[in-house]
Amino acid sequence: MKKNMFIAVVLSVLVLVGASFLQELLYPSASSSHSAAEHTLSAVPEETRTQSAHGGAADTQETTQPAAHPSGQVLVFPESETEERVERTYVVRTPLVQVTFTNRGGDILSYQLREHYAAQRREYVEMVEQARPDHRAFSLALGDEYAPNVNALFQVKQEIGARGVHSIGFYRSVATQHADGTRTPFVLAKRYVFYPDNYMFELHVSLSADVLEEREDSRQGAKVRAVAETNAGPATTVLARANGFDFGTASYTLRTPPEIGPERNAADKYEFRTFMVGAGGKAKTYALKGDGREQVDTPVSWASVSGKYFALIVLPNDADSLKRLVLSAPQAETAVQHHIAFVRRAVAQPAVADVYRVYIGPCAEQYLSAYNVASRNPYGLERTYIDAVAVSGGILYPLEVLLKWLLRLFYTLIPNWGVAIILVTIAIKVLFFPLTKRSFIAMQKMQELQPHMQRIQERYKGNTQKIHEEMAKLYREAQYNPLSGCLPTLVQMPIIFAMYRLFNNYFEFRGAMFIPYWIPDLSLADSVWTLPFALPVTQWTQMRMLPVLYVVSQIMFSKLTQVPHTEQQKTSMTIMTYVMPLFFFFFFYDAPSGLLVYWTAMNGVTLVQQLVMKRTANKNKT
């Protein structure tokens, strides 16, 4: 009996490990219209003196002290009457997004999606998480990925153009101070352009020499350009050499936010973050763990950080302008962060002008596929293939496409995604009913042979080879194939895996109500009662009904499909009937409702099919 129990436990573990391996094999990881009247750009100048994760303590007066740089050069952010001296915030609103900027660095403090709300809260989804003074969203550093971000105050210019196009620009005079006291001034600028009804915006980054006249200079032994002193600070001889922008082999580095939103729940094991890089029409996934780092030195078309339902994707206008791409997953105090650094090559020209197109929004094909067709987006982009971020990939992708089509079909008939899940499950089970029936017939045949098998085991007890020979002879005489009951299930496995993946990640399920007050969101676990305390060991604070229904349906199905067994098999059958469903109860307790609706519906439909076939078989016997 102990031996049988051990074998049953080992087999159960192998099934779970095998399922996980198969899922990884199949899904490899290397991992409505809006009113134009809402097109408003609101500048909200706010003097800020408090410490915050966004901007830090605002200065009332800008410093002129030179700052040491990893490249060995000294950068100066000079004062002038035209430079801004107070930190202010600016808000851009479109029908789809609400973006808060700071003039410190010209960075983004907050990026909210106005059509999507945070889980169980009436707040917009926040896509900029864990921002801090030394790393905000789209911070710029002069130099490579190790250089500090520019944290000076910028001048601001904002416009609303034709067709509701929003533009907000940030400009700043900077200078490189040389050993002889001379300075090379230049202008650093960032400009964001937002189109209405679009989740993508443009980010223009430029560095340009403020040149007035050209003359020879004996101290430098080269042709230099004289520049206005007001841009470099008082009482300073200003010389700008025409040698471009090179701060330690790089012009600048652009950084995405430390982490994308929405805010992650540590208990949600179904949420994830992953990197993906597109190049040459192909996409590669990078699944970095804590403190992981990956450097990409080849030209890339785009790079992304994505989660279960939302994504941030950056498309550089000139892939060859990038020296490298650095994907980072540093371990922060409470969680692993995920961000990307775009390192721009050094240039020998007196000006740098780059454009990045940034998508921040739903990780869904219906949105991302618009950037494969020029007529469907305002940028004229085509064949970007950024929709690969929303596609699970693997050999089961065609099945997922079919399942999505079925879901949408049933949703048009009955506009409830929970009902659509059940109808798709029923349709799939009906489609595969011939295979289910074949498996049932094989099970019935096994029940008929069970007495003969028991007699063989008793007669040749201790002689394993003889038992195998007699069993094979029995199967031949009865024209029974032991694998005939397994093959129908194996054929259905790809569909089961595809449905599991789809129902766990389908964007349309986010915020979709199935049953009011019980299942208000198919992307979240259900809840029937909130406990005033956390349960010991599990730390559960919510009582859920779907996991209970799933376990009950699984136990009923297991008992109905059991074949007669010997006393020696009793322990292993008990484990398979009761212990495994209980294991899955804990495993799926916090699973999204949509996934459990699918599993429970599949068990229910299969249970009904088994009852019908069993009743039909009993009638035929009589």
From Swiss-Prot:
Gene3D superfamilies, alphabetized: 2.70.98.90
Positions of the UniProt region annotated as Disordered: 37-71
Segments traversing the membrane: 6-26, 413-433, 483-503, 513-533, 579-599
Locations listed in the record: Cell inner membrane
Keywords on record: Cell inner membrane, Cell membrane, Chaperone, Membrane, Protein transport, Transmembrane, Transmembrane helix, Transport
Protein's membrane topology: Multi-pass membrane protein
Single biological process term from Gene Ontology: protein insertion into membrane
GO-annotated molecular function: membrane insertase activity
Main location (coarse class): membrane
Any one GO cellular component localisation term in the record: plasma membrane
The organism's place on the tree of life at top rank: Bacteria
Family: Belongs to the OXA1/ALB3/YidC family. Type 1 subfamily.
Quaternary structure (record): Interacts with the Sec translocase complex via SecD. Specifically interacts with transmembrane segments of nascent integral membrane proteins during membrane integration.
Protein task: Required for the insertion and/or proper folding and/or complex formation of integral membrane proteins into the membrane. Involved in integration of membrane proteins that insert both dependently and independently of the Sec translocase complex, as well as at least some lipoproteins. Aids folding of multispanning membrane proteins.
Identification of the protein by name: Membrane protein insertase YidC
Name of encoding gene: yidC
